[in-house]
Amino acid sequence: MRKHILFSFFMLLSYQIMAQYVDRSFFKAGFHASTTLGDAADFANLGIGLDLYQHWGISKKFDLGLATGVQYYFGLDSTIDVGPTAVTVRGEDTVFLPLAGFFRFYPTKSINFGGDIGYALGLNESTDGGFYYRPTLSFDLSPSSALNFSYAGVVIEDNTWTSITGGVIFRF
């Protein structure tokens, strides 16, 4: 009888503990526009991108997860004087595929900030990959969408490709 009472007590206790658990894992996808800064501004001035995130809530205030997407920057055209004529050369577009881990901190229900850290693969022939970082700030528009602002950087040997991004992200 004593074993049955203890068993029943632990079953009720485990039920209560599991009833308190809330699964905070979710997927986010969105798009952004960007403008380049620093060395990158010599080669491109505007970019667009796709962002994909998988969040896992580790507490009410913190999330960890994985991030990827595509960052596409439009190459600048340059004009070269060849004798009496000018020749316009089309600048090469630059494309990165970031593979990163991230963290997010939620000081309020509608604002979060954090950062992505990982490696960005260069997808075109003349672009190498490098260390990727992206601090972010996000403001919820609704329970399923948010405005997302970030500063993104890819460190390639002695140069850093940097940009400021702004976009919309949707929660699924």
Q: Language-model segments: which ranges?
A:
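Repeated loop/turn-to-beta-strand initiation elements of outer-membrane beta-barrel proteins
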Residues: I5, K61-L64, S110-F113, F139-F149
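Short glycine/proline- and aromatic-enriched beta-strand/turn motifs that initiate or cap beta-hairpins
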Residues: A19-G65, W161-R171
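Predominantly the C-terminal beta-signal and adjacent terminal strand-loop region
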Residues: R24, F74-S78, D128-F172
